[in-house]
Amino acid sequence: MSDYIVVKCGGSMLNQLNAVFFDCIKKLQQKYKVVIIHGGGPEIDAKLKDCNINVEKRDGLRVTPKEVMDVVQMVLCGSTNKKLVMNLQKHNLLAVGCSGCDGNLLQVQPVSEEIGYVGEVSYVETALLKGLINMGYIPVIAPIGVNGNEIYNINADNAAAGIAAALGAKELIFITDVDGILHEGNLVKETDESEIATFIETGVITGGMIPKVQAALASLKMGVQKISIVNGTKDFTEVTGECIGTTVTKGVSIA
């Protein structure tokens, strides 16, 4: 079993992280090698508004022409990344912030010309991550990548799944503001892609949880073996280092 854990923290969660979250990262780091990937959607939207640039999304992906890509890069690689790095270090967790273009860490395949500079992970330079971890640092990755000489925006879920799959990670943890999937008010501790399809069809999973489980299912298809959906505002780690939340595994494939 791999000793890597990949943690994905969406942009909407970054301002909600408290001391409990950083304590959980400490506990994980005692047993595993931790990599963190973050988003930055709300900050990007705010900066685009300041610049009088239209915000447009298609099928959950940000339409990213050149002028939008410049803002995305500035926000993700600048203030958002460094704020998270500084918060980690404030809690005595040594971290190094970098983006997917540093050292060609995340190489991408463009999604389509219609949505501009948006790519999906095609290759991860894992040696860079392993080197930072072996020196005692937590890599904190901004989800942009490269294709040739061009820089591309990457959906943070796709970046996290690509990194987790490339590292053969034990687990990919999605940090959210809910405890996991709830069924009749009770936490669903374990589920698989077949049961999730049923949950969506019967209305057990609704609203904001749908994109979270869709991201988990996409991660399974990329080769990640185990995904946990946890509440980042609460203690989400057991004494054993296992996560408290909903664990999603592949189970029986959907026909």
Curated annotation (Swiss-Prot):
Question: Which PANTHER family does this one have?
Answer: N-ACETYLGLUTAMATE SYNTHASE, N-ACETYLGLUTAMATE SYNTHASE, MITOCHONDRIAL
InterPro entries in the record, alphabetically? Answer: AceGlu_kinase-like_sf (IPR036393), AcgluKinase_fam (IPR004662), ArgB (IPR037528), Asp/Glu/Uridylate_kinase (IPR001048)
What is the species of this protein? Answer: Bacillus cereus (strain G9842)
Keywords recorded for this protein, A-Z: Amino-acid biosynthesis, Arginine biosynthesis, ATP-binding, Cytoplasm, Kinase, Nucleotide-binding, Transferase
Name assigned to this protein: Acetylglutamate kinase
Spell out the residues of the site Transition state stabilizer.
K8, K212
UniProt similarity note? Belongs to the acetylglutamate kinase family. ArgB subfamily.
Where in or outside the cell? Cytoplasm
